[in-house]
């Protein structure tokens, strides 16, 4: 397992991994397997780490988007997210007697949206940034998965 955290991923391998992770996340969500989200998160971190290695950056930087999302969740809960989550649960169970402040709801959604936009931007940046030519401190350059003649 630890070998997944080492080495480099080129842009081609990165985008294939991103596509597979998105499909896996949708499939697991459709199957109501939310518990598998931790595994998907770990795979995102591994994908980001290997791509960061290709551009000469340390892998720990991949933890920043996850930390940002965690902070956004904590801010949301601190600002009244518990009633917000209770209201969502009530709506799912068709109990519409629980009301929350619109301002709190918009604030929580806004904080989460900022975190998601940052993760999206980070993912795109890693996918378009050129990797280091030749070997770097993380190993030799990655080979292309699909060879072009």
Locate each region found by the language model.
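Membrane-helix interface segments in multi-pass membrane proteins
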Residues: 24-41, 68-119
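Central hydrophobic cores of alpha-helical transmembrane segments
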Residues: 17, 61-70
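Membrane-interface extramembranous regions at the lipid-water interface
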Residues: 1-25, 40-60, 122-149
């Amino acid at each position: 397992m630890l070998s997944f955290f080492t080495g480099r991923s080129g842009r081609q391998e990165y985008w294939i991994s991103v596509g597979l992770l998105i499909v896996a996340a949708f499939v697991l969500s459709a199957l109501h397997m939310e518990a598998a989200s931790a595994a998907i998160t770990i795979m995102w971190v591994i994908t980001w780490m290997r791509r960061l290695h290709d551009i000469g950056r340390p892998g720990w930087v991949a933890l920043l988007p996850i930390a940002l999302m965690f902070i956004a969740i904590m801010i949301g809960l601190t600002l009244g997210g518990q009633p917000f989550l209770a209201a969502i649960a009530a709506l799912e169970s068709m109990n519409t007697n629980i009301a929350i402040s619109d301002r709190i709801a918009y604030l929580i959604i806004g904080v989460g949206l900022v975190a998601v936009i940052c993760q999206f931007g980070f993912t795109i940046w890693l996918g378009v940034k050129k990797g280091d030519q030749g070997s770097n401190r993380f190993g030799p350059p990655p080979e292309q998965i699909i060879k072009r003649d």
